[in-house]
Amino acid sequence: MDYTMDIKSFSGGINEYTTEGLLKLNEAVKSKNCNTDSGSLKTIVTPSLIKDFGERIVSLMPYYNNTIEDYLVGIGTQIRNSNNSSLLSYALSGSKLDSLNFEYKGKKIFVFCSELDNVGMIGELGNRKLKNRRISYNKEGEIDGYIDANGVKKATEAEITTYAPKGRFIELHYDRLWVAGDNENPDRVYFSTAGVNGADIEDWTSPIEEAEANQHGGFIDVRSYDGGKIIGLKVIFNAVVIFKNKTAYKVFGNSPDNYELVQLFSSSGAIADKSICVGNNGAYFLNNDGIYFYDGTNTNLISQKIKNTISRMNSNYASNSVAYFYNNKYYLAIPIDNSTTNNVLIEYNTLSNSFVLHEIGDISDFIEINNDLYFSSGNTVKSLTKGNSYLPLYWETANYDFGMKNARKNSSYIYFRGKGNGSVRFRVITEKKEKFIDIPLTSTETLYRKKLKNKGRMFKMIIENVNNSNIEITNPQLLVEVDLD
């Protein structure tokens, strides 16, 4: 009696959680460098070089220069543009940066923070540190001076020598800048004013009287009493969410006079700060257990299907993990085994709830630019989605017994639709032996029927691209005769 090992779709991705005997045929026990978005099995490109900066890149940031979409890099103590020119007249203490682009006073600006340095800006309003002062008005409502953070009044803004706070994380919410991650105050979140005279990102001063709360900036101390510090700051569901090592909090309210701090959830392990991404009406993040999704009410583990990969994560360097949400996918680069840098890229398709893994190493940051996903790797910036060569593809099914464990089986033909510029290799493995066939593909989709004989009681199929060729395979079917005697 004839049966088929029929892979109707590859959309299930990799599944390291379910017992192999219970895996669906659209899932793989092992895979690498596959695109399964449309249900077919496709190769992915080798990331292409955008620019080599000659020194290791720590941060990669989008930058909107008028109408031009560009990027900046953090290298050493500098912020450089895509031409490798430094943009600041002063040296930073480090180049691990967080940043924002927005319009302020009718001008486009880039605002950044770097943990040990005061918040700074680059753009049409100058390249400098942000100051911390409040504007003083006379009875007629005219500006009559500036009062610094120490309460000392100055005649001109140029005389102000007090500056915006320090921090590693920055967000914009209701016209206020929010900053956290100050080494000297690791539980503190600062915010600028958005008072009666509009947003002022250079007024972080605390109100002198309670009635003035909405006219100034200020800060909130987020005490968790578990030894944790703030390691992330995101705007989710139109609210500021503060991530600490093992907990997360939400700031309810739209102005200082009604701010309320509420704990959202606690975590069983340290959260990797650069793994936190907002997408699909929630937040994704990594901790020691795996990848979690917070939907505004509940926090759920979603990475069971790649539990073996997560278990290999080098916990000593997990804080180096970086992520980005792009085209309904959560991309997460992590270090596994003995690697100190990120050497595996996890791609989670939120629409199909499936995972694929890519062998792309040393990813230190991501940005979306020009409808593409760029990443930094060592000294270079690369494109993840554009390239002229292809990575080695590998897809391995579970062992399949056709529901008859003890029956003898013989395979005869492999059927599939395919196209490409090289050859595809099908390997059929049983408990007795392995057989394979390399099949040259045409550039237009063609129906193929090729002999592929093997025998045994359990069948496994492995699909690969020969010599890193570009291939696309749809609905492979292995015809098998089962001896029921």
What are these regions (language model features)?
Residues N83-S85, E124-G126, G253-P256, T297, ...:
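Short loop/turn segments that connect beta-strands within beta-propeller blades
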Residues T46-R56, S89-L97, N138-N320, S354-V356:
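Beta-propeller and closely related beta-pinwheel folds
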Residues G74-G76, S114-E115, G181, F243-N245, ...:
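Structural signature of WD-repeat beta-propellers
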Residues K131-N132, S136-Y137, V179, G422, ...:
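Sequence-pattern detector for short linear motifs
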